[in-house]
C-alpha cells in the first residue's frame, strides 16, 4: 500500500508553531506557587534580569518578619504588573540563593532593587513598603502606567444583620476578629488575616470573619470584647465562643485552624499529604492491600459499612476509598500506580484550585493502597 506524502507546505507551519510554543515555554518566567511574583534562582537571575524588561527584585529571607509583613503588598504588586510587557516583579530567597544576594550587595532583608532594561546595575528602593508606593516607583522607573489590581477579599464582613446567621451556624467553624479601624495592631494583623481567609476559601465548613467593633459596640460588649484586636473562635460545638490566645503569624493561625477544624492546608492554601485521609479507612486499606481477591471483597464491604458512619467532608472522602478499592478489584493493583501518575501530570497543568483539591485528595488516598 502506498504511503501518503505530506506536503512540505503543510508541515512548515506546524514546525513553526511548535518552535514558537517551545520558545515561549522556555522563555516564560517561573512564577512562585500561589502568587504572581517571578521566583528567581542562581541559574535564572541573569537570564531574566537585565534583559529586555525592567525588573523590581525583592531579596528576602523566609524567616524575616519584615519580609512576611511585606509579602501581601508585594504579591498585590505582582498581580497588578503580571501582564505588563516592559517590566516584571520578582523575588529571590537569599537563604536558598546566597551567591546572588551577595553579588548584589544584599546585607539586610528585605532589600528591594530596581534593575533597568538591559542593565545589571541596580538602584536601591528606599520608599515605603506599600503596594501603592512600590507601584508608583515601578511606573516611574519603567515608564509604565499600571493601576493596582483590586483583589477581592475572602474575609466575611460581619454586622448586626448577619452576625447570628453566620457565627451561630452549627455546621460551620468560625474565627472572628473584633477590630477597630484606628487600631495599629489591627492594621498590622489585616494582611495576615486576609491571607488566612484566602487559605481556607475553598473549605465550606470554615469561615474567617471580622467585625468593626468600634462601629458595632453592642455586639462587641455582648462577647466581652474590651481591647483590639480580639479574636474569638466559634466552633460547631461551642457557639458561646472561646478566646484565641495563640500567635498572630500566618503559621500560627493555620496550625490552629487545622487542629480545631480537621482541615489540612499549608500557608499557601494547598492541601497537605494528610488531606482526605481517614485513620479507620487507612487501616482497612492496608488490610485490603495484603489480602487475596476473595478476602478483598469482604474488606470492601467493611469499608462501605465504615463510610456509612461518616458525615460531612469525611463521608465524601470515604467514598474515594470505596471507588479506589473497586477499581483495584476490577483492574488489578497496577491501577494505583497508573492513576497516581495521571493525577501528578494533571496537577502540573493549569487547573482550578477546587479541581487541584480533588486530585490531591485522591492521590493521598491512593498512597494508602500502594505502600
UniProtKB/Swiss-Prot annotation:
<feature type="domain" description="Thioredoxin 1">
    <location>
        <begin position="28"/>
        <end position="143"/>
    </location>
</feature>
<dbReference type="Pfam" id="PF00085">
    <property type="entry name" value="Thioredoxin"/>
</dbReference>
<dbReference type="InterPro" id="IPR036249">
    <property type="entry name" value="Thioredoxin-like_sf"/>
</dbReference>
<feature type="site" description="Lowers pKa of C-terminal Cys of second active site">
    <location>
        <position position="248"/>
    </location>
</feature>
<feature type="site" description="Lowers pKa of C-terminal Cys of first active site">
    <location>
        <position position="129"/>
    </location>
</feature>
<dbReference type="GO" id="GO:0006457">
    <property type="term" value="P:protein folding"/>
</dbReference>
<protein>
    <recommendedName>
        <fullName>Protein disulfide isomerase-like 2-2</fullName>
        <ecNumber>5.3.4.1</ecNumber>
    </recommendedName>
</protein>
<comment type="function">
    <text>Acts as a protein-folding catalyst that interacts with nascent polypeptides to catalyze the formation, isomerization, and reduction or oxidation of disulfide bonds. May play a role in storage protein biogenesis.</text>
</comment>
<feature type="signal peptide">
    <location>
        <begin position="1"/>
        <end position="27"/>
    </location>
</feature>
<dbReference type="InterPro" id="IPR036356">
    <property type="entry name" value="ERp29_C_sf"/>
</dbReference>
<keyword id="KW-1015">Disulfide bond</keyword>
<dbReference type="InterPro" id="IPR013766">
    <property type="entry name" value="Thioredoxin_domain"/>
</dbReference>
<dbReference type="GO" id="GO:0005576">
    <property type="term" value="C:extracellular region"/>
</dbReference>
<feature type="active site" description="Nucleophile">
    <location>
        <position position="183"/>
    </location>
</feature>
<comment type="similarity">
    <text>Belongs to the protein disulfide isomerase family.</text>
</comment>
<dbReference type="InterPro" id="IPR017937">
    <property type="entry name" value="Thioredoxin_CS"/>
</dbReference>
<feature type="site" description="Contributes to redox potential value">
    <location>
        <position position="184"/>
    </location>
</feature>
<dbReference type="GO" id="GO:0005783">
    <property type="term" value="C:endoplasmic reticulum"/>
</dbReference>
<feature type="active site" description="Nucleophile">
    <location>
        <position position="64"/>
    </location>
</feature>
<keyword id="KW-0677">Repeat</keyword>
<dbReference type="InterPro" id="IPR011679">
    <property type="entry name" value="ERp29_C"/>
</dbReference>
<feature type="disulfide bond" description="Redox-active">
    <location>
        <begin position="183"/>
        <end position="186"/>
    </location>
</feature>
<keyword id="KW-0732">Signal</keyword>
<feature type="domain" description="Thioredoxin 2">
    <location>
        <begin position="147"/>
        <end position="262"/>
    </location>
</feature>
<feature type="active site" description="Nucleophile">
    <location>
        <position position="186"/>
    </location>
</feature>
<feature type="site" description="Contributes to redox potential value">
    <location>
        <position position="66"/>
    </location>
</feature>
<feature type="site" description="Contributes to redox potential value">
    <location>
        <position position="185"/>
    </location>
</feature>
<dbReference type="InterPro" id="IPR005788">
    <property type="entry name" value="PDI_thioredoxin-like_dom"/>
</dbReference>
<feature type="active site" description="Nucleophile">
    <location>
        <position position="67"/>
    </location>
</feature>
<keyword id="KW-0413">Isomerase</keyword>
<dbReference type="GO" id="GO:0003756">
    <property type="term" value="F:protein disulfide isomerase activity"/>
</dbReference>
<dbReference type="Pfam" id="PF07749">
    <property type="entry name" value="ERp29"/>
</dbReference>
<dbReference type="InterPro" id="IPR051063">
    <property type="entry name" value="PDI"/>
</dbReference>
<feature type="disulfide bond" description="Redox-active">
    <location>
        <begin position="64"/>
        <end position="67"/>
    </location>
</feature>
<keyword id="KW-0964">Secreted</keyword>
<feature type="site" description="Contributes to redox potential value">
    <location>
        <position position="65"/>
    </location>
</feature>
<keyword id="KW-0676">Redox-active center</keyword>
